[in-house]
């Protein structure tokens, strides 16, 4: 299989994994709190719709926060497993895990520190019910800086070595 095909499969797997983990966390919380309404498919994306009127502000804030917590935890599990992933013989698997790791490390911190101000609040609207928006943006900006450093110092070199084998 060509390198380009592996890259496309890796990118597709990252998008799917992100939606499963991030939106899955929202779904689980909505089901636990009895506020699940429906799953909305929008273009290439999806969103968990809830009965927000049945939630307290704290519950709504937690609902909006759990997606990024789930991707954060997943990202660092993948960071911890980078050596084992790199030792697998399958270049397709390594490509998929590489792009999934990038997605888990970067998407939510980029969105919640910078992009939410340009593209609508999304999860920020709910999280800001728990904490001031500026504080959230600063915290996610710090997480983003740390995650970029982890990517540059750990993930990128390990995968470069793994793909050279």
Where do the language-model regions lie?
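Active-site scaffold of zinc-dependent metalloenzymes
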Residues: 1-12, 31, 72-76, 80
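Metalloprotease/metallohydrolase-associated module, dominated by Zn2+-dependent proteases
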Residues: 48-162
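Alpha-helical transmembrane segments and their helix-start/interface "positive-inside/aromatic belt" motifs
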Residues: 2-20, 90-99
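Small-residue-rich helix-interface/hinge motifs
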Residues: 10-60
């Amino acid at each position: 299989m060509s390198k380009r095909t592996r890259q496309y499969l890796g990118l597709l797997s990252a998008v799917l994994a992100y939606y499963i983990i991030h939106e899955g966390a929202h779904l689980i919380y909505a089901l636990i709190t009895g506020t699940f309404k429906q799953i909305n498919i929008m273009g290439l994306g999806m969103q968990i719709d809830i009965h927000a009127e049945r939630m307290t502000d704290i519950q709504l804030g937690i609902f909006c926060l759990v997606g990024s917590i789930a991707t954060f935890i997943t990202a660092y599990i993948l960071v911890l497993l980078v050596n084992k992933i790199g030792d697998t013989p399958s270049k397709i698997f390594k490509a998929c895990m590489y792009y999934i790791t990038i997605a888990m490390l970067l998407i939510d911190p980029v969105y919640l520190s910078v992009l939410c101000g340009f593209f609508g609040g999304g999860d920020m609207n709910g999280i800001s019910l728990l904490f001031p928006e500026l504080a959230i943006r600063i915290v996610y900006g710090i997480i983003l800086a740390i995650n970029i450093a982890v990517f540059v110092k750990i993930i990128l070199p390990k995968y470069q070595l793994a793909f050279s084998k």
